[in-house]
UniProtKB/Swiss-Prot annotation:
It comes from Haemophilus influenzae (strain ATCC 51907 / DSM 11121 / KW20 / Rd). GO terms for cellular component: plasma membrane. It is found in: Cell membrane. Gene3D superfamilies: Glycerol uptake facilitator protein. It is a multi-pass membrane protein. Signal peptide: none annotated. GO terms for molecular function: glycerol channel activity. Disulfide bonds: none annotated. Belongs to the MIP/aquaporin (TC 1.A.8) family. Keywords: Cell membrane, Membrane, Repeat, Transmembrane, Transmembrane helix, Transport. This is Uncharacterized aquaporin-like protein HI_1017. The chain crosses the membrane at residues 22-42, 63-83, 112-132, 138-158, 188-208. Aquaporins contain two tandem repeats each containing three membrane-spanning domains and a pore-forming loop with the signature motif Asn-Pro-Ala (NPA).
Amino acid sequence: MCQYFLKKIRNVWERWFTYRLWFGLSMVSIAVIFGPLTGAHVNPAVTIDFWEVGKFPTELVLVYIIAQCIGAFIVALIVWLLFKDHLDEEDNQNCQLGSFATIATNSNNLRNLLSEIVTTFSLLFILFTLNHQQPTNGVAMFFVFTGVAGGVMSFGGLTSYAINPARDFMLRLIHAIMPIKNKGTSNFDYAWVPVLRPVIGAILAAWLYKALF
């Protein structure tokens, strides 16, 4: 996201295309690396979703969510460290914040809430059907990529496509507590939306999956 927002590097690539490509490929990379170890659970919404349909043990839900938040915090700290000079030179405060957390393009939180519910619902339902059909790894990773990249293409312009409560909140926290020259608000008044909406979308996807399968 830093390469998407920050002024000295944001014009190196076609921003929207590379942002979509990066988002999809990063999710595939995570799934490939951590899939055999944890089922690629790096998102609390995913963990809650699979727990809701009985595919994840109750005693591990809180453990995984805490680990996901710690991981997001560490990654955010690394991002701040690597891009600190560019962040300090950025004169657009929204671009500084957008390098860490999501920013909605309008102030209607109800529509923003609905947008992320729909996007998370779509992605999680894809993951459920993949888990149900159990395609070969290459095919499964392709659908993970298209699900994420397609979501960014379709809805990213509305709310920046949060889908992961841990990623959004912990990176927003790093923006708030770490020194960045001339930074503005971390917009915690909006933070509840990207935290709550993916969970709602995930639960709705779980209910539909249980109803159909």
